[in-house]
Design a protein with these regions (language model features):
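Secondary-structure boundary/capping micro-motif
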Residues: 1-105, 110-266
């Protein structure tokens, strides 16, 4: 009798609880990207958001939507207030206009600003694929994650930006900063990486190249696009652009100082 009662008591205690949350159906419809990035065609863009929140996530603040084409490292970025679905798609539309070739795939992380029905339908209507990273795997989006730091954070910094007036001013900065980086700032890509003992041996390209040069080398980019880029490149002056970027950045921080929310900047 004692054994029967003990067995009954054990069954009263469940080994696991019941979940009251169902997985979002949108995640099952947007595929997780698999495969080698080295074989990706031009127009395969990783995309992410950078929060200009300062020391607190309280209240409204500005985000930068940052995108990087994986094969060419061609970048595009726009500023928006908060990261709502409509605002994010509007930023993606504007960034697409600044990319000289057609976008064939957008690859964000699992953030709700990108993984939603509005963004999915927008991509489908344009004939573009929307894929996503594995949750909690930041390295799946490594190209744009890297540029979140050494482009957005390096140029804009960590200051809180929360004034509506600053959105237009920050986009005014990106109007010059983006072509400056694409045409004149070179980088060396990693060719191989192997472990030797306790260290990693990293082999990089022998010569640094700008995104502009990488586009010209691509066989999957049309000659019409390349000719248009060459003509644009001839009209640009890096020294003049750098001075203009600095001037526009001063406007951004001046507007934030006068129009921002002081109590949230601390």
């Amino acid at each position: 009798m004692k054994k029967r009662v003990a067995k009954f008591v054990r069954k009263c205690f469940l080994t696991h609880g019941k979940s009251t949350t169902n997985p979002s159906s949108i995640h099952s419809l947007i595929p997780v990207r698999s495969g080698d990035w080295d074989t990706a065609p031009a127009g395969t863009a990783q995309i992410d958001t950078v929060a200009h929140c300062g020391h607190t996530l309280a209240g409204d603040f500005i985000y930068t939507v940052n995108a990087t084409d994986v094969p060419t490292l061609w970048g595009a970025r726009r500023a928006q207030l908060n990261k709502g679905q409509t605002a994010t798609v509007t930023s993606m539309e504007q960034m697409e206009k600044g990319v000289p070739f057609s976008i064939v795939e957008w690859h964000p992380d699992s953030g709700s600003e990108f993984i939603n029905w509005h963004c999915k339908e927008w991509c489908e209507n344009k004939g573009q694929q929307l894929t996503r990273s594995r949750p909690n795997h930041k390295n799946d989006n490594c190209f744009v994650e890297e540029r979140n730091g050494h482009i957005v954070r390096r140029w804009i910094g960590y200051t809180r930006l929360d004034a509506m007036e600053v959105v237009a001013a920050l986009n005014f900065v990106y109007d010059v900063l983006t072509p400056y980086l694409n045409h004149f700032v070179a980088s060396r890509r990693t060719v191989s990486k192997e472990r030797v003992g306790a260290r990693w041996k990293v082999t990089r390209e022998k010569r640094s190249k700008t995104p502009y040069e990488r586009v010209l080398e691509r066989s999957d980019v049309s000659e019409t696009v390349k000719t248009k880029l060459r003509l644009e490149h001839e009209t640009l002056n890096p020294l003049t652009m750098k001075r203009e970027i600095d001037r526009r950045l001063q406007v951004v921080f001046s507007l934030q100082k006068h129009c921002g929310i002081p109590k949230l900047e601390k």
